[in-house]
């Protein structure tokens, strides 16, 4: 078994993601591991049929989304509690969630991904597949899917 030293926790700020972060922090305590808390902002369509956003508006929206996400991650860390001996590194990426999660797994040498087992349901999930499903299928490390309580 590979030693767990780097744990990635993707978050969408739901109570389910809170549970995943709590689980990751407990595992980090046991293994003296780092926790990487990641939020991925999906790239939005900037043009509709008759209207496009200008670059300044897009840049402002991006900046505001990143700042808001960073603030929400700090609140999430405070909510679940962070032991002094566990390092939690939070950051935001922009892109397709499952793709960014998989890139981070490679780039940060992640040994374990802990994420909420929830998300899209019904027809959309059936047609597209959930983020958790895609990550579990394609990750090169173990993935722990945490169910809500």
Model-derived segments and spans:
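Short, hinge-like loop/turn segments at secondary-structure boundaries
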Residues: 52-56, 107-108, 131-132
């Amino acid at each position: 078994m590979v030693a767990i030293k780097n744990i990635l926790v993707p978050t969408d700020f739901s109570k389910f993601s809170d549970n995943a972060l709590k689980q990751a922090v407990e595992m980090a305590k046991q293994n003296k591991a780092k926790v990487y808390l990641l939020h991925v902002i999906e790239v939005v369509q900037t043009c509709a049929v008759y209207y496009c956003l200008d670059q300044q508006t897009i840049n402002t929206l991006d900046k505001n989304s990143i700042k808001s996400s960073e603030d929400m991650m700090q609140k999430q860390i405070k909510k679940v509690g962070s032991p002094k001996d566990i390092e939690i590194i939070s950051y935001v990426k922009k892109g397709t969630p499952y793709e960014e999660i998989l890139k981070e797994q490679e780039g940060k040498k992640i040994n374990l991904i802990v994420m909420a087992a929830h998300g899209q349901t019904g027809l959309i999930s059936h047609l597209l597949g959930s983020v958790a499903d895609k990550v579990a299928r394609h990750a090169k490390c173990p993935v722990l899917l945490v169910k809500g309580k």
